[in-house]
UniProtKB/Swiss-Prot annotation:
It is an enzyme of class 4 (lyase). Heterodimer of a large membrane-associated beta subunit and a small pyruvoyl-containing alpha subunit. Binds 1 pyruvoyl group covalently per subunit. Coiled coil: none annotated. This is Phosphatidylserine decarboxylase proenzyme. Keywords: Cell membrane, Decarboxylase, Lipid biosynthesis, Lipid metabolism, Lyase, Membrane, Phospholipid biosynthesis, Phospholipid metabolism, Pyruvate, Zymogen. It is found in: Cell membrane. Pathway: Phospholipid metabolism; phosphatidylethanolamine biosynthesis; phosphatidylethanolamine from CDP-diacylglycerol: step 2/2. The active site is at 88 (charge relay system), 145 (charge relay system), 248 (charge relay system), 248 (schiff-base intermediate with substrate).
Length: 283
């Protein structure tokens, strides 16, 4: 079965309603039922609870508490690199931005402007730059950390669809990451501007950042923007910057001539938070 045929049911599903329902259920305090659901999830997806700061499944009051669990201190040491991996997951795609085009999958490209909510001025900063797309599976740790030091410039919530973001859907839905709901975070870094985009998906109940809290819901259907030029929101490499309540994808954009990705960083490669991702060009 081709990927395009495999994803056809997703066009018919009431994705917004499913996501709203999943969000309510994930935040519900249902006692033993919550514990049973978490146990089932751990078994189904092979979640390694020995990595969790709190491995006691029965102690989580809600599914969201479990899903956004912290790791044991020191479990993901930071490599000595200009850019470290911001999440646990697997590389979806990685490489150069060809003018303004980002590679999604064979036969599928999308533009930086589309990803960034139609902001051509922001997109121009990444012309002929570099990108990395990392998929977080259900079993992964779902907090996002800073790949390098950065000062927050602005944050945009871009409404959109809620397709799944698994590899099959990435191959079957054109412009997937520029169609789905997303939170765009623009930072000024020692490498120049960096965009860190949190992409939503089916049953991703919400996305949150450490400086704002929960960004969505509400889902107003209208783009929202927060400017931080007059506020000092500075995060260091490795600091937590946000989290998904149910899993999804992050997309990183760097300007031209800023970074060179480490050897072996290619599609389908499993990656872990803190490992060396890229070095600064010219060093």
């Amino acid at each position: 079965m081709s990927d395009r045929i495999a994803v056809l049911p997703q066009y018919l599903l009431p994705k917004q309603a499913l996501t709203s329902f999943a969000g309510r259920m994930a935040s519900a305090r249902a006692g033993q039922l919550t514990t049973a659901v978490i146990r089932r999830f751990v078994a189904r997806y092979g979640v390694d609870m020995s990595e969790a700061a709190n491995p006691d499944i029965a102690s989580y009051a809600t599914f969201n508490d479990f899903f956004t669990r912290a790791l044991r201190p020191g479990l993901r040491p930071l490599a000595d690199a200009a850019v470290v991996c911001p999440v646990d997951g697997a590389v979806s795609q990685i490489g150069p931005i060809e003018q303004d085009q980002i590679f999604q999958a064979k036969g599928h490209l999308y533009s930086t402007a589309a990803l960034l909510g139609g902001d051509a001025e922001m997109a121009a900063q990444f012309q002929d730059g570099s990108f990395a797309t990392i998929y977080l599976s259900p079993r992964d740790y779902h907090r996002i950390h800073m790949p390098c030091d950065g000062r927050l410039v602005r944050m945009d919530h871009v409404p959109g669809a809620l397709f799944s973001v698994n590899p099959t859907t990435a191959r079957g839905v054109p412009g997937l990451f520029a169609r789905n709901e997303r939170v765009v975070c623009l930072f000024e870094t020692p490498l120049g501007p960096m965009a860190l985009v949190l992409v939503g998906a089916t049953i991703v109940g919400s996305m949150a950042t450490v400086w704002h809290g929960q960004v969505n819901p509400p889902r107003t259907g209208q783009p929202r923007r927060w400017d931080y030029g007059d506020r000092e929101v500075v995060l260091r490499q490795g600091d937590e910057m946000g989290r998904f309540l149910l899993g999804s994808t992050v997309v990183l954009l760097f300007p031209r001539g800023a970074v060179q990705f480490m050897p072996g960083w290619e599609a389908a490669r499993p990656v872990r938070l803190g490992e060396a991702m890229a070095h600064r060009c010219g060093i």
